[in-house]
Amino acid sequence: MAAASPACWAWRCIPDWENTPKVFVVYCTGSAWNGDEHLSVFDWDGTALVNEEILLTIQAGGIHNGSRLLVLPDNTLLMTAGDIGSSSLAQLEGSLQGKTLRLNLDGSVPEDNPIDGSYVYTIGNRNSQGLALGANGIIYSSEHGQNSNDELNIVTAGGNYGWPEVEGFCNTIGEQAFCAENDVIEPLEAWTPCIAVNGIEYYNHEAIPEWQNSILMAVLGGLGGQYERLSVMHLAEDGLSVTGEEQFFSSFNQRVRDVAVNPYTGSVYVAFNGTSYPGSGPNIIKEFRNEAFASSLDDAMQLGATLNAFPNPANDEIQLDWGMPLSAGAYEVYAYNGQLIESGQLFESSTILKLQTASWNAGSYFIRAIHSQGTVTATFQVAH
């Protein structure tokens, strides 16, 4: 690994983990100003990442390498790539820097990408370090501004986000002319001075109802460190605008690097990254959860039974078979982004459950069945 900004930047597990335990990783090699950024996929053998396959290699820089990864329901992969400190690259369609890239999971170029034969999905990005999939298929990103205008954006195929000609909203004469000529997409929110926005996740779990339909955003706090926090960005019902912001954990005096959500319990995991740039420690992850909601899982034990899904992927209907009679209980089905899709009762001595999936979006789903004998979980796919 190189010194300075280049490092291991992002990783993402494949949604169908139980059947295909693979991990995508973005990392840099070489020196700080003469290196490469690699997108690789590894197999997980239960103890280590093995069998690396490099899917994509692009030029890296001493700063602004990105990167975040997001697997979409159509089994494509988004990867953010920073401008590596050369802002002019962001508007060049032939460059992969200063972009959001989209790949098939095997590393090939999707046929429906905006530019034929190119990984480029969006242009005009400075350094996006957050990606999240929300309701209705909306993709959100967070992006570092230079000296002003950190951004929360909606990612749109073929979109131009303005950098370096536009920072934040189109609110100067020069920016307005460029925006009109290039159909620049303005952010949902922008922050001046910079607060150093970082990892984001969509939250819609019933464990914390007050946070449902919101973006959880990690905030490093800028070079001065006075703005560090976890921001809860409440969204309008359609997800296309922000209705308010709540701020948490500022009193910890810790830079908030990233955030993740447990799709089963609704727990929120927050990565703290020390008190100052570039990270003085302690570097820790803390779990925050509603213990009243999660208490049904505290003493649960995994059954010896396995839960099989057929057909997988499903179209209009899927049958879940755990092969042994269960006591009465309840089940919950979650989309990969944590949204509760369906819940219901399990009947005494039941061995199968049929779900009607015709109206569900294509993508990955989790099911958990909770009963007096314990908890059974599984993942499955829906494809139309």
What name fits each language-model region?
Residues M1-A7, Q59-S67, Y121-G124, S251-V256:
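Short glycine-/Asp-/Thr-/Trp-enriched loop segments that recur within the blades
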Residues P6-C8, D16-E18, I84-E246, Q254, ...:
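Beta-propeller domain segments
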Residues C8, G66, S128, V197, ...:
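Core-facing hydrophobic residues within beta-strands of well-ordered domains
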Residues G35-V71:
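Asp-box/WD-like beta-propeller blade repeats and closely related beta-sheet repeat scaffolds
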Residues G46-L49, G107, E237-G239, A292-A294, ...:
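Short coil turn/linker residues within repeat-based beta-strand modules
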Residues L72, N104, P263, A335, ...:
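Short, acidic, Ser/Thr-enriched surface-loop or helix-capping motifs
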Residues D299-F310, A314-H384:
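C-terminal outer-membrane/trafficking sorting elements
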